[in-house]
């Protein structure tokens, strides 16, 4: 097992990465506030891992809540289901919530923990690659709204993130690929050597090599922990973690949440960001080709939905949380390993990019 730390003064917390961690009661115990625990999971993960975790936490008074799986259920309605379960169970501030699942469950449970009685502790137990390398770390919690993704939420840090790489053995190949979009993102924005390593070892990741999985999870979490420690509430460098997300969130919202997995939309959005950089003279043809090739090798889309127009994108992108004073701001790569935030890219450039990437 390896341990990383997100350094946020008195709110600092560990990230544990290893195999078989779901069965380690000693790992959970220091991060559980009292005797009561509510495990929230979904109907895909529950048959696989809920009983395992219940057995691990056998010494506690455990309630469980099983929600429907999928991005379509990351809603205020699901949030209210969690609230109702907590209230009906007369849970207090000494209850610890545990998010057992992927990014949707983690975001939902984190938001519920932030709001219930103005804040109760929670633990992230991510079971998908995307949640293990990205969404479980950093305290972003939210639900979607029909008019925009992650528009209702809070910054609220977990007490711990417990990453069991064995959970990836039951992950469908499409979900594994979706998680790779976030892994590749870290190479593009932060670490050129890591990007090169991914080019050489993508097949090891796809064959679920424990060493390769540990490597990518630890590297991504280390980068994110560093960024979050510098900029917890996304006023500066943390915005770089949104490479591909402004285009990608527009795809998700326009297509209907769940039609495109988050990672698939981010992959297409990353290509659109790279093409924007190319047209602005920020990025070389060679780097754009390498980005596309690695995304393709990871079984991710490199073209966006054919039925989306420029107006469809802008309708959603102007609601993006990075926008300021009505002006669009985009994270754009300047080289593999380096990116920055750019304001007010010309509409003619965006139109050309959107036309070229469908």
Curated annotation (Swiss-Prot):
GO terms for cellular component: cytoplasm. Catalyzes the conversion of 3-deoxy-D-arabino-heptulosonate 7-phosphate (DAHP) to dehydroquinate (DHQ). NAD(+) binds at residues 69-74, 103-107, 127-128, 140, 149, 167-170. Binds 1 divalent metal cation per subunit. Can use either Co(2+) or Zn(2+). Belongs to the sugar phosphate cyclases superfamily. Dehydroquinate synthase family. Its EC number is 4.2.3.4. The keyword Amino-acid biosynthesis applies. Keywords: Amino-acid biosynthesis, Aromatic amino acid biosynthesis, Cobalt, Cytoplasm, Lyase, Metal-binding, NAD, Nucleotide-binding, Zinc. This is 3-dehydroquinate synthase. Pathway: Metabolic intermediate biosynthesis; chorismate biosynthesis; chorismate from D-erythrose 4-phosphate and phosphoenolpyruvate: step 2/7. GO terms for molecular function: 3-dehydroquinate synthase activity; metal ion binding; nucleotide binding. Its cofactor is Co(2+); Zn(2+); NAD(+). Zn(2+) binds at residues 182, 245, 262. The keyword Nucleotidyltransferase does not apply.
């Amino acid at each position: 097992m390896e341990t990383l730390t997100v350094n946020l003064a008195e709110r600092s917390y560990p990230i544990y990465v290893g195999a078989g961690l779901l069965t380690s009661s000693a790992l959970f115990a220091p991060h559980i506030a009292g005797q009561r625990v509510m495990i929230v999971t979904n109907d895909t993960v529950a048959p696989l891992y809920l009983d395992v975790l219940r057995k691990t936490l056998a010494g506690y008074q455990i309630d469980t809540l099983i929600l429907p799986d999928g991005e379509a259920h990351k809603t205020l309605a699901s949030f209210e289901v969690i609230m109702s379960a907590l209230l009906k169970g007369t849970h207090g501030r000494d209850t610890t919530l545990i998010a057992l699942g992927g990014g949707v469950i983690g975001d939902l449970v984190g938001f519920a923990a932030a709001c219930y009685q103005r804040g109760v502790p929670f633990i992230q137990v991510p079971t998908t690659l995307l949640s293990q390398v990205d969404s479980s770390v950093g305290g972003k919690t939210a639900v979607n709204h029909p008019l925009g993704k992650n528009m209702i939420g809070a910054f609220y840090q977990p007490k711990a993130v417990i990453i069991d790489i064995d959970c990836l053995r039951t992950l469908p190949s499409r979900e594994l690929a979706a998680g790779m979009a976030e892994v590749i993102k870290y190479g593009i924005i932060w670490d050129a050597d890591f990007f090169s390593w991914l080019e050489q070892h993508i097949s090891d990741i796809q064959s679920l090599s424990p060493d390769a999985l540990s490597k990518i999870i630890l590297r991504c979490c280390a980068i994110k922990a560093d960024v979050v420690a510098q900029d917890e509430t996304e006023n500066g460098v943390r915005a770089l973690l949104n490479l591909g997300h402004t285009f990608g969130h527009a795809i998700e919202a326009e297509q209907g949440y769940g039609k495109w997995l988050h990672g698939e939309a981010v992959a297409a959005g990353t290509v659109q960001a790279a093409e924007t950089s190319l047209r602005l003279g920020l990025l070389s043809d060679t780097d754009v080709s390498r980005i596309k090739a690695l995304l393709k090798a990871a079984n991710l889309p490199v073209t966006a939905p054919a039925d989306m127009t420029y107006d469809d994108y802008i309708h959603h992108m102007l609601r993006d949380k990075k926008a300021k004073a009505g002006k669009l701001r985009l994270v754009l790569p300047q080289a593999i390993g380096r990116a920055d935030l750019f304001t007010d890219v010309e509409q003619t450039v965006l139109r050309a990019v959107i036309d070229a990437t469908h």
